[in-house]
């Protein structure tokens, strides 16, 4: 009798269930395992199959007690009827709103006032835009008096009753339009005189491209405080009124500060006069950009810290430095950081794009390329303002005549050791022979000599400044009689006292301890003439 074959027992202990994750793939080439070589299922397939078998938990009646793979349902909730949640948080009546509106308009006219909590203030209710202002027609004429059976108006009200009044209104609107567009008005006057330059080299349009203006508007939009850097030698010539108008109309919440850079190139009384004049419009500070020996750094840092403290609701504030080319915007940022973080050069156009600089954890600085606003400046004015690189000028000698007219003769004698000259050509010829700028055959190189003079002008080696419009007691008297040699010591002591008084005024206003000054502005009778008004 044959033995009954017993069923083999799995003694290896390996699982054989199809949903077991630890199942071994013994059959090679069968099935679709993860490695492609086993008959079992992968762990991802096993988890997916288990998910299909999950069911919600129900009671005997079939009501779902607990959903599988879902969060537990919360019971119905009800918000407490408390005044803290449903009541008015801020209530103001019409009289208080009108009073606050008048106070706000009177205070905001002063640029030294700052709104502390702008987000909590309903500015949309306090400022009536001209386009959104109501006409208040029912206050002037009720609806019943204009339409219906009780209407009293027999004919419609027109803009003008006769042609004379219509013509007058058209003239008034035309005059208002011309006043608004002052640049177009100046160009029109030039056309009437017949002295308008129709063709101008592209180098005289530097700083006016769309890319540069785009960089300026990006800096303005990103800044909480805008610092307009001005040249202390000619503040009004390097001032951009278009920028100030843009901030007043479109960005009233941004703050504008004037910074008089290069104050070491002008006498102390002129700096004090310009501070007094410009401070009537915006906060103004005097500054001398230098990493080692600067002036006004403490005052500017103090102002920036005050703005950061006022903007306590923001994590950090951004300060944008804008202005004409070659006024020292990048040098000011390097002075604040006490190291070279921005590229600087004594030529315009070194900064190409805007640049973010970290000053502190809460203050960031933005360097902007120089922007030139289109105005009525001639080519010579553009060159003398430092907008154009002198090396790119084809004929630099044609701009020397204006330099000789703006600078006193004594300053040119002291700078170039030339006693007398007839005109600008004679001046260049003598200077070429003195400095050795000669061509073949001993001919003077007028172009190279003229470029050298313009370089000295832009870098401050030739003393020049525009006096302030209202000169105070510290300014030197222009009508003083010539002094004899025996009174030189008394005059020197008087001028020394006046200069020390002006310096003390600037120090007290800006809380500084030392003032850098140019060596040429001394106290002797010969050197003191530099501090007088330039012709």
Swiss-Prot record:
Residue spans of biased composition, Basic and acidic residues class: 17-29
Keyword Nucleotide-binding: yes
Record GO terms (molecular function): GTP binding; hydrolase activity
Amino acid composition bias (Gly residues), ranges on this chain: 30-41
Annotated tissue distribution: Expressed in roots, shoot apical meristem, leaves, leaf sheaths and flowers.
Positions in coiled-coil regions: none
UniProt entry tagged with the keyword Nucleus: yes
Region annotation (G5) ranges: 290-292
Listed Pfam families: MMR_HSR1, NGP1NT
Chain spans, region G4: 261-264
Keywords noted in UniProt: GTP-binding, Hydrolase, Nucleotide-binding, Nucleus
Compartments it resides in: Nucleus, Nucleolus; Nucleus
Positions of region (G2): 349-353
Span list, region G3: 367-370
Notes on how activity is controlled: The GTPase activity is stimulated in the presence of ribosomes, particularly of the 60S subunit.
Annotated stretches, region: Disordered: 1-42, 464-494
Cellular-component GO terms for this entry: nucleolus
Family: Belongs to the TRAFAC class YlqF/YawG GTPase family. RsgA subfamily.
Function recorded in the entry: GTPase involved in pre-60S ribosomal subunit maturation.
Subunit architecture: Interacts (via N-terminus) with the 60S ribosomal proteins RPL10A. This interaction is enhanced by the addition of GTP.
Name of the protein in its database record: Nuclear/nucleolar GTPase 2
Source organism of the structure: Oryza sativa subsp. japonica
Organismal lineage: Eukaryota, Viridiplantae, Streptophyta, Embryophyta, Tracheophyta
């Amino acid at each position: 009798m044959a033995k009954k074959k017993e069923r083999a027992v799995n003694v290896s202990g390996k699982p054989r269930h199809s949903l077991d994750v630890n199942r071994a793939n013994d059959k090679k080439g069968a099935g679709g395992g993860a490695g492609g070589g086993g008959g079992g299922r992968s762990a991802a397939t096993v988890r997916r199959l288990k998910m299909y078998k999950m069911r919600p938990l129900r009671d005997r009646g079939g009501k779902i007690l607990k959903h599988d793979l879902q969060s537990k349902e919360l019971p119905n909730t009800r918000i407490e009827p408390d005044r803290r949640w449903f009541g008015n948080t801020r209530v103001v009546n019409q009289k208080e709103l009108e009073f606050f509106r008048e106070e706000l308009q009177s205070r905001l006219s002063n640029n030294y006032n700052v709104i502390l909590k702008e987000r909590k203030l309903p500015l949309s209710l306090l400022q009536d835009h001209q386009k959104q202002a109501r006409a208040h027609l029912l206050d002037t004429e009720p609806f019943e008096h204009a339409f219906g059976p009780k209407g009293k108006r027999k004919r419609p009200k027109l803009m003008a009753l006769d042609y004379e009044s219509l013509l007058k209104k058209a003239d008034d609107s035309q005059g208002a339009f011309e006043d608004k567009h002052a640049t177009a008005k100046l160009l029109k006057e030039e056309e009437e005189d017949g002295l308008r330059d129709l063709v101008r080299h592209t180098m005289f349009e530097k700083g006016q491209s769309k890319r540069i203006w785009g960089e300026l508007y990006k800096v303005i939009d990103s800044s909480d405080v805008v610092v307009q850097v001005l040249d202390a030698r000619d503040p009004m010539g390097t001032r951009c009124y278009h920028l100030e108008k843009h901030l007043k109309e479109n960005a009233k919440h941004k703050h504008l500060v004037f910074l008089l850079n290069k104050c070491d190139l002008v006498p102390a009384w002129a700096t004090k006069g310009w501070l007094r004049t410009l401070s009537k419009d915006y906060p103004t500070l005097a500054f001398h950009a230098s990493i080692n020996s600067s002036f006004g750094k403490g005052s500017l840092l103090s102002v920036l810290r005050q703005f950061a403290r006022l903007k306590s609701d923001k994590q950090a504030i951004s300060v944008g430095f804008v202005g004409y080319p070659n006024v020292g915007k990048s040098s000011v940022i390097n002075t604040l950081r006490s190291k070279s973080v921005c590229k600087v050069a004594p030529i315009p156009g070194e900064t190409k794009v805007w640049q973010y600089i970290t000053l502190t954890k809460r203050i960031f600085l933005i360097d902007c390329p120089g922007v030139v606003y289109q105005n009525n400046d001639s080519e010579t004015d553009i060159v003398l303002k430092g907008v154009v690189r002198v090396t790119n000028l084809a004929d630099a000698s044609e701009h020397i005549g204006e330099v000789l007219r703006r600078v006193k003769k004594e300053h040119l004698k002291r700078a170039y050791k030339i006693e007398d000259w007839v005109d600008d050509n004679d001046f260049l010829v003598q200077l070429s022979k003195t400095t050795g700028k000669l061509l073949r055959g001993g001919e003077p190189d007028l172009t190279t000599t003229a470029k050298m003079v313009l370089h000295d002008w832009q870098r401050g080696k030739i003393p020049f400044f525009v006096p302030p419009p209202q000169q105070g007691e510290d300014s030197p008297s222009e009508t003083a009689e010539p002094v004899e040699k025996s009174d030189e010591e008394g005059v020197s002591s008087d001028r020394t006292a006046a200069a020390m008084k002006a310096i003390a005024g600037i120090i007290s206003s800006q809380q500084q301890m030392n003032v850098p000054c140019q060596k040429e502005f001394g106290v002797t009778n010969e050197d003191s003439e530099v501090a007088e008004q330039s012709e």
